Amino acid sequence: MSFSFFRKAPKFWERRGPTSLLLWPLSWIYGLVLHARKLIQDTGFVKPKPAPVPIIIVGNIRVGGTGKTPIVIALAERLQQLGWNPGIISRGYGGKGSSAQTSPLQVKSNSDPTLVGDEPVLIARRTHDQFPIWVFPKRQQSIRELLKHSPNVNVIISDDGLQHSGLARWPAREGGRDIELVVRDERGEGNRFLLPAGPLREPATRERDATLFTGKIKSDDHQIGLQDEYFLGRRAFSLLSNLGKPYQLNNPANTQTLTQIADSYLPNKITTVAALGNPQRFFDDLLKNGIAGKTISLPDHATYTPEFFTKLNAQCILITEKDAVKCSAIMDECIWVVPMSLALSDNLAEWLQSILQRPDPYRYTL
């Protein structure tokens, strides 16, 4: 059951009503399948071989984007500052080659996003190819290839993969040194139903080592306080993102501030386009910075053509960096790319460090 069944997240995912209740029996069946898979995994009949280095899994239980990619970038950069040599693996969502792919592919900043996916190329570009990045649906194979070509890597960050049973892990909460991070945005768990009646891949109470909050927090969410350090009995950390200085798509050296854009163009001459799992967050962030105008949300991983932008008839078109990797061949001077950065708190970095420094638990088991 896939999010791709819906072009966009349906409204009934946010609040329980007739449609979600009508679909609930399918969600119940989906839940049974999840439970059966977990039982098989727990019995050990199918046991993947663990990686020789710690794994940090950055995922979500809600389908669609919750802001994982900026977190992966921030994690890799912060871990490097702490003296680690991180590598990154991903399934390669959005890449047309993933289904026909027979072996892992290494991703560089000049890789074709239609083959390896939008996010991996974005990560490579933002980090200037500092970290080895490999993509393949079977993440265990990606790990083997990554370590084969980059034996100095001593920690691996998995962009998504919480639900990937083939990715062996010994979670920190159970005494291991692998870390499962659940990213949660302002939408929370919606109506808290599993697919397709709700937006959840797994139950809302799924175990995790920590929860990372992104975006604004709803004032009526009694489970979260501004000073809370725990969520569902585990550590929780709030991450704040900032929009950077937009740069021209066909001339990245040409930049201007969001304030300059707001002062230079009338709102009816500005169009913002986003193909994200949660585009409204991008639109809201721009509005906070004084950027009003028309907004267009497209399905996650949508592709673009020059004709699409021409038909917008806008003097200024704003897009995300994720969308920009798919627009390399488009030479429209009206398009400006808005970068987004995210910094990890010292508390989060220290907590990660304390777990990653644990001895390999597999060395002490029979």
Swiss-Prot record:
GO terms for cellular component: plasma membrane. Pathway: Glycolipid biosynthesis; lipid IV(A) biosynthesis; lipid IV(A) from (3R)-3-hydroxytetradecanoyl-[acyl-carrier-protein] and UDP-N-acetyl-alpha-D-glucosamine: step 6/6. GO terms for molecular function: ATP binding; tetraacyldisaccharide 4'-kinase activity. Signal peptide: none annotated. Its EC number is 2.7.1.130. GO terms for biological process: lipid A biosynthetic process; lipopolysaccharide core region biosynthetic process. ATP binds at residues 62-69. Keywords: ATP-binding, Kinase, Lipid A biosynthesis, Lipid biosynthesis, Lipid metabolism, Nucleotide-binding, Transferase. Pfam families: LpxK. It catalyses: a lipid A disaccharide + ATP = a lipid IVA + ADP + H(+). Belongs to the LpxK family. Transfers the gamma-phosphate of ATP to the 4'-position of a tetraacyldisaccharide 1-phosphate intermediate (termed DS-1-P) to form tetraacyldisaccharide 1,4'-bis-phosphate (lipid IVA). This is Tetraacyldisaccharide 4'-kinase.
